[in-house]
From Swiss-Prot:
GO terms for molecular function: chlorophyll binding; electron transporter, transferring electrons within the cyclic electron transport pathway of photosynthesis activity. Belongs to the PsbB/PsbC family. PsbB subfamily. This is Photosystem II CP47 reaction center protein. It comes from Cucumis sativus (Cucumber). Binds multiple chlorophylls. PSII binds additional chlorophylls, carotenoids and specific lipids. The gene is psbB. NCBIfam families: PS_II_CP47.
Amino acid sequence: MGLPWYRVHTVVLNDPGRLLSVHIMHTALVAGWAGSMALYELAVFDPSDPVLDPMWRQGMFVIPFMTRLGITNSWGGWSITGGTITNPGIWSYEGVAGAHILFSGLCFLAAIWHWVYWDLEIFSDERTGKPSLDLPKIFGIHLFLSGLGCFGFGAFHVTGLYGPGIWVSDPYGLTGRVQAVNPAWGVEGFDPFVPGGIASHHIAAGTLGILAGLFHLSVRPPQRLYKGLRMGNIETVLSSSIAAVFFAAFVVAGTMWYGSATTPIELFGPTRYQWDQGYFQQEIYRRVSTGLAENQSLSEAWSKIPEKLAFYDYIGNNPAKGGLFRAGSMDNGDGIAVGWLGHPVFRDKEGRELFVRRMPTFFETFPVVLVDGDGIVRADVPFRRAESKYSVEQVGVTVEFYGGELNGVSYSDPATVKKYARRAQLGEIFELDRATLKSDGVFRSSPRGWFTFGHASFALLFFFGHIWHGARTLFRDVFAGIDPDLDTQVEFGAFQKLGDPTTKRV
């Protein structure tokens, strides 16, 4: 046929059997990728330290999605929450991966069958004998079935009525686990961070889908609407389907980047806004203040801070710190976290407590500045020592650690104090192993960043695809130069001007 690469899909334009076949093959490819990717990730995933080396630090992409839907155990004998298990059951990580690969193989065979047996009676219009699809009826069927699936997911899977529930955690990502969720029917259901909204919205949307599907199955569209929206043209289906997909992609890019109950930080890592707003830092200070109010010493109060909470308060876990072309996991960047050194408290020679000003998200380097409780600069690491007035040496800054591995250790040596001041710019201080993975010390993004970038990019691309195919189907007659409502018999090539009998060729 000699079609250019960008027109090859016209081969299925008027061929319903093979149109179905290529869509089944597409499903086979997607399911096959998902299953294969899951097996690859399971082969390289290290489940030994869920606190300091969680899945998102290791660059896992499909494991978090399985986990949020209720999968936590592996046939390898480990659980995502730590510890060992003896009977993971069929719906383990490997079981889900295997099910996808099996489904992919069945879809592959079905696609081949439908490619060979394309001329089925079901696709033939009994009036004309030509291949035809009743698109409004197919729309109703798909709407009904997707509504049924949506309702079932919300009413059974999420609620735990028949299923495991979903991953639910506290606001600081410390106590996450899979549990049943009750639907939230009040105004709180519209809070994107309330898990109950996931159940209630799926139940509501599913009910609407079922009713809308039944409506479209029982009511035919008016003729003027049918013609006006080109409901008989398969490219209309393509255009509106692309619209649904790009809209969904934009929505999930937002829920992933800004955070929501559907994207827990234990599975996808923290958001950049939690660093920008000092979200974890405030909670840590609140807990320490509570401890001090209960007559605990500074050392005791800081020692009770969970290592998991301290680790979130580290700039290396900020997804916006990774560069666009820095491939690999976070562990390949700043290394594998080994342990929390503790919280450094800086003081000048007058005994004032000093706080290191933290590095903003979009800086690669930042001056080391220490301020007191009133925000007044008291010390720094100067660029020009000759002009310095606030250098660590001049001010006599010391550092003492509370909690962590260096609990109770203090330093007054200026070089050591400056070293820890520089590291305190990046949040809580952790020992990082860069040797194991030959990590290069350059920050990487988390799967949260990759997912957002990918979905926002494809959403934009698909938006233009929707405009393109929508315009093609709405203005098909204009582009073709033929009026679709032309009733008179036109013999192509009989007239010099198409359809004008006064210009008959001799």
